[in-house]
């Protein structure tokens, strides 16, 4: 259990260091641009980081759970077809 706690502490420290580095890079990029564009650059970088995190999360989710996701997709398709046929029969 102590090994896991030590590993989690190392991960937290690495995340803090990574965040400081990213903030340093963003700060450098902001000061190369005119003052009027700085908020737009900051917004663009934040959106880019958000998209990267969502992409990584989605790839991990799909790669680890593709079987259950396929079952859920098949279930949704089956229920959709059933509801369409049911509404066609009821409306006639």
UniProtKB/Swiss-Prot annotation:
Membrane topology: Multi-pass membrane protein
Similarity field: Belongs to the orthopoxvirus OPG096 family.
Native organism: Monkeypox virus
Compartment(s) where it occurs, according to its Swiss-Prot or TrEMBL record: Virion membrane; Host cytoplasm; Host endoplasmic reticulum membrane
One cellular component term from this protein's GO annotations in UniProt: membrane
Keywords, in A-Z order: Early protein, Host cytoplasm, Host endoplasmic reticulum, Host membrane, Membrane, Transmembrane, Transmembrane helix, Virion
Parts forming coiled coils: none
Protein name per UniProt: Protein OPG096
Function per UniProt: Early protein involved in virion morphogenesis. Participates in the formation and elongation of crescent-shaped membrane precursors of immature virions in cytoplasmic factories.
Transmembrane region(s): 39-59, 67-87
Keyword hit for Metal-binding: no
InterPro entries in UniProt: Prot_L2
Oligomer status and interactors: Interacts with OPG158.
